[in-house]
């Protein structure tokens, strides 16, 4: 299995500015992510950033890093620039690991790479896990996904999908936990074929993408297929807020 991992790392986060450099148990967060990715089967792990502080920090801990344009609208655009800088062939595979996932299991990195290699019809691959608690089902920050019998994603949404017509007529507090496994939360790790990245940056933002603010809908809107499968391991949430950062600090400090 041959693939590389790219970790996009933006410094200017609106909710947690400077989070790639946030200290977690004596190391910057981006170093934790990098070291987790290095435990996968990737042939190369690269941080892609538009910030000199992040660039210098990665160099200091011995990581590989590329400086990319500050004008990218998404991490996917940044990945395409990395593929271009590295001169990757169109059939090569890049796994996008988010720069705010210091607890990412290496096994899921391998899994998503294997899934795109094992399904020739897929231009991208990603993962999901069951959502049980009603509050999370109705939480717009928890992106839901539905798929067909072959594992091809049909749609991603911030809304509750599928919609249980009878059960969802009552208040959320009275909705029973979902135990049938049909409600799946999307996990934000992707494997892409470079050819898909080259096409992605040429496509305009789709209407559905603009409404939901989910860039993967641009792929589906242009007729390409995304393979989706349940993650082989539990994937702890990433770091979006100070509360998330405190949670991760506590976990890694005690480990």
Swiss-Prot record:
Q: What is its EC number?
A: 2.7.7.38
Q: Which HAMAP family match?
A: KdsB
Keywords of this protein's UniProt record, alphabetized? Cytoplasm, Lipopolysaccharide biosynthesis, Nucleotidyltransferase, Transferase
For this entry, the protein name equals 3-deoxy-manno-octulosonate cytidylyltransferase
Q: Name a single GO biological process.
A: CMP-keto-3-deoxy-D-manno-octulosonic acid biosynthetic process
Compartments reported by the entry:
Cytoplasm
Q: Gene3D superfamilies, alphabetically? A: Spore Coat Polysaccharide Biosynthesis Protein SpsA, Chain A
InterPro entries for this protein: Cytidylyl_trans, KdsB, Nucleotide-diphossugar_trans
Pathway assigned to this chain's UniProt record: Nucleotide-sugar biosynthesis; CMP-3-deoxy-D-manno-octulosonate biosynthesis; CMP-3-deoxy-D-manno-octulosonate from 3-deoxy-D-manno-octulosonate and CTP: step 1/1; Bacterial outer membrane biogenesis; lipopolysaccharide biosynthesis
Task: Give a GO cellular-component term.
Answer: cytosol
UniProt catalytic activity: 3-deoxy-alpha-D-manno-oct-2-ulosonate + CTP = CMP-3-deoxy-beta-D-manno-octulosonate + diphosphate
Species source reads Saccharophagus degradans (strain 2-40 / ATCC 43961 / DSM 17024)
Look at the named UniProt entry and state the broad enzyme category this protein falls under.
transferase
Its predominant location is: cytoplasm
Q: Does the keyword Cytoplasm apply?
A: yes
Q: What is this protein's function?
A: Activates KDO (a required 8-carbon sugar) for incorporation into bacterial lipopolysaccharide in Gram-negative bacteria.
UniProt-listed Pfam families: CTP_transf_3
What is the similarity comment for this entry? Belongs to the KdsB family.
Q: Which GO terms describe its molecular function?
A: 3-deoxy-manno-octulosonate cytidylyltransferase activity
Q: Which CDD domains did the record assign?
A: CMP-KDO-Synthetase
Q: Which gene encodes it?
A: kdsB
**Protein origin, superkingdom:** Bacteria
């Amino acid at each position: 299995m041959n693939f590389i991992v790219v970790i996009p790392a933006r410094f200017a986060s609106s909710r947690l500015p400077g989070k790639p450099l946030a200290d977690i148990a004596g190391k910057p967060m981006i170093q934790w992510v990098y070291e987790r990715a290095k435990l996968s089967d990737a042939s190369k792990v690269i941080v892609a950033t538009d910030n000199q502080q992040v660039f210098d920090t990665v160099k200091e801990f011995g990581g590989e890093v590329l400086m990319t344009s500050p004008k990218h609208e998404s991490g996917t655009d940044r990945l395409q620039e990395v593929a271009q800088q590295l001169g990757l062939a169109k059939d090569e595979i890049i796994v996008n690991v988010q720069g705010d996932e210091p607890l990412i299991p290496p096994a899921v990195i391998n899994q998503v790479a294997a899934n795109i290699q094992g399904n020739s019809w897929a231009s991208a691959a990603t993962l999901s896990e069951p959502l049980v608690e009603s509050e999370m089902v109705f939480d717009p920050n928890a992106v839901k996904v539905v798929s067909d019998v072959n594992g091809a994603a049909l749609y991603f949404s911030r809304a509750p999908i599928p919609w249980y017509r009878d059960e969802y007529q009552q208040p959320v507090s009275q909705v029973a936990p979902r135990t049938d496994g049909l409600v799946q939360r999307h996990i934000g790790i992707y494997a892409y074929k470079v050819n898909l990245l080259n096409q992605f940056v040429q496509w305009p933002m789709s209407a559905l993408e603009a409404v939901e603010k989910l860039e993967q809908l641009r792929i589906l809107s242009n007729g390409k297929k995304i393979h989706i499968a349940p993650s082989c391991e539990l994937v702890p949430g990433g770091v979006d807020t100070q509360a998330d950062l405190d949670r991760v600090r506590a976990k890694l400090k005690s480990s």
